[in-house]
């Protein structure tokens, strides 16, 4: 191509990269040609405003065209303040009259910088010059006013325009849709078609969010038809899927997804998000498998949806696979993906991995902090959640409603009402309390801390009292065991004209379960059927749980077998737990086997239940088989699973295996240490128990009453009197833990077996709690062992007073004749069996 002015300008327009632009610029300099305007525009396309400015400054008296090029370049690069500065300098300092293009670019800069005061001044200048009706200026004014949420002014400008092109109509429709005026946007679109404006892809694209918010399937189908007619189906597939999802028409969304023969990453991500939004998590994971098989690039929407699904079903193996694929796709650096990963691992019980992911996030935003606080809260680590919230506040990251909701739940968990009150005050100052979610969390926090006066005040301040607020207040009363007041709240809910939702029914069932109130539970069941909630899974789960807690296992079995709801892993877990509560471990094992036959995927809770069943049956072979499955699934390091394995092996006589499982637990909380202490105590390994007890304190873990009971029990079995006395004194003096009747029974038995009856009786005399059968029984056994007849008779007399209908007390004193005089005594038949 010969080098001339025309060819060089053509080459300048066709530059695809910055290096090519520099070469063409060099050729222009060599040729002595200076197309300043074209060069400024070219450098602006590569966002090199510094070089554009050098060229501009080299011109002695730049005209309005060059000024416009600079203003447009700054606006295009997002440097809106600089663009407005140039506009002001041109018109005010240099005295150059702006033309319609100057005004258009300046108004776009006002919209981009949200400087609407400047925009109003420019509008006044436009009106003075009589340029309001110009199609370019008018469109820019409409866009600016829509960004300012001043739809009245935008519509006035729009209506004054004599000539409107498709861009003008699209801008007005988009402005209405983005500001929540969906119906107005749809009406304007109809006007647009009535005016015979040739709609383009932008017209339809702007309308999709408006139609989505209307949630009308017939309107969705009309828009879908227009998209097909215009031939935009491929480009609009993601938007259509999202639109149908918002209208709860998942079947139509699936049809769009399947009809698109060339699916891009956006289509896959939107479809997965649609499934996740509607609770179809198994389908999300199936799509993920297909996406991976087809080697489709995964975007962050798909990654977040897949991780959410894995977390919900508790499938850690699948979650790890999604993590690996996200790493391959280079998504791991994205904050939203890292936050989703963090949530998935925490919900699957791998809190340590979640913590590490949180630490590795470089630019932690409020969402990341909130997710980690929520993770601690879900794991029951209320103190850690509160501590992290304090760290967040220390580095001046402003919490949102989600953050405050989680940390208020943490305050409720540790009964930290003073801190909860401080957070409540912060929510009021930050104007977050008015958000219903936060207000409900405040009510729940006060109620669960037993502070019903501020809870009721917060409740009364609510402008709109919905079912969620009533539920939160009622659950507070349930937690303190006041079923009557909880049901009074539910009655007031009806008086206020608030319709109960499914969560209300679940709350009422939880109250009945907590108080073992079968009669009320049956009435609630009737209300559930009346309102049509019986087919909802979480309601059915609460029903089964209520029946098992109210000694109505037969009713729970009937409900589970009838299956008026869709069974899930959760429902099988509840049924297994019900059998265990009623001492039917064999049925729990049978339920687990049936669950596997029906192809349900067990989660961590399932494994905890089956390991508990194996422990109760001392069925070592079953326990070892489950342990093998746990290793394959990667659940062994999870705290609840690890605790159950420690207990199972201890009850099956394999204390070495218990120790190994204890070591493998990644996060050892107080329950883990107590389980291992109990195992040592049951096996009479007092020295191991004491050593572990000391190690526990060295790890800065404060022992609780259960810890002391376990180590005292171990000392009792081994006859370690001095060690037991030291630990008992340490419990009250150092750790400020009030001794309970079980602790006294241990000490009386320990002292009595050592023949220290004086100390044993003195301890009983100094007891701050009422003596029980356990304490007198311990004294009776030890006194009989040492042939102390006077003391054994005294202990026996007290036992008979406490439990006159217990035949064992009479038989111990060889008063077998008196047993026949005791009426209505039933003895559970004994049995013996072997594991087959």
UniProtKB/Swiss-Prot annotation:
SUPFAM superfamilies (alphabetical): TPR-like
Family annotation (InterPro entries): Pentatricopeptide_rpt, PPR_At4g14850-like_plant, TPR-like_helical_dom_sf
UniProt keyword Repeat present: yes
Swiss-Prot/TrEMBL keywords: Repeat
Region (Type E motif): 775-836
One GO molecular-function entry: RNA binding
Pfam families named in the record: PPR, PPR_2
PPR repeats: 1-35, 36-62, 63-98, 99-133, 134-164, 165-199, 200-230, 233-263, 264-298, 299-333, 334-364, 365-399, 400-434, 435-465, 466-500, 501-535, 536-566, 568-602, 603-637, 638-668, 669-703, 704-734, 740-770
GO BP, one annotated term: RNA modification
Record bears the keyword Repeat: yes
Entry-linked PANTHER family: PENTATRICOPEPTIDE REPEAT-CONTAINING PROTEIN (PTHR47926:SF347)
Entry's family note: Belongs to the PPR family. PCMP-E subfamily.
UniProt protein name: Pentatricopeptide repeat-containing protein At2g39620
Record organism: Arabidopsis thaliana (Mouse-ear cress)
